[in-house]
């Protein structure tokens, strides 16, 4: 889990637009963020495998 202070700091707007970065709203992770789903890869995988994200299925070939 990310530190609470870092999550709060990221939510506030920064002085410069370039310094802003995306964080997962569920766990606060700053890396491996998917804009389309607004969450990190770990939370995306967890929710997709449990069937909570509509239209996302596990691929098999």
From Swiss-Prot:
Cofactor(s) listed in the protein's UniProt record: Zn(2+)
Statement: the UniProt record of this protein carries the keyword Electron transport: no
GO molecular function, one term: rRNA binding
Domain of life: Bacteria
Comment on bound cofactor: Binds 1 zinc ion per subunit.
Annotated Zn(2+) binding sites: 24, 27, 40, 43
A GO cellular component entry from the record: small ribosomal subunit
GO biological process, alphabetically ordered: translation
InterPro entries, sorted: Ribosomal_uS14, Ribosomal_uS14_bact, Ribosomal_uS14_CS, Ribosomal_uS14_sf
Assigned keywords, A-Z: Metal-binding, Ribonucleoprotein, Ribosomal protein, RNA-binding, rRNA-binding, Zinc
Function text: Binds 16S rRNA, required for the assembly of 30S particles and may also be responsible for determining the conformation of the 16S rRNA at the A site.
Listed PANTHER family: 30S RIBOSOMAL PROTEIN S14, SMALL RIBOSOMAL SUBUNIT PROTEIN US14M
Family the entry assigns: Belongs to the universal ribosomal protein uS14 family. Zinc-binding uS14 subfamily.
Record text on subunit structure and interactions: Part of the 30S ribosomal subunit. Contacts proteins S3 and S10.
Name of this protein: Small ribosomal subunit protein uS14
Organism whose genome encodes this protein: Geotalea daltonii (strain DSM 22248 / JCM 15807 / FRC-32)
Lineage: Bacteria, Pseudomonadati, Thermodesulfobacteriota, Desulfuromonadia, Geobacterales
This protein's encoding gene: rpsZ
């Amino acid at each position: 889990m990310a530190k609470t202070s870092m999550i709060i700091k990221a939510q506030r707007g920064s002085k410069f637009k370039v310094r802003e970065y995306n964080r997962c709203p569920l766990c606060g992770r700053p890396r491996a963020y998917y804009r389309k789903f607004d969450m990190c890869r770990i939370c995306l995988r967890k929710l997709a495998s449990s069937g909570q994200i509509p239209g996302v299925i596990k691929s098999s070939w």
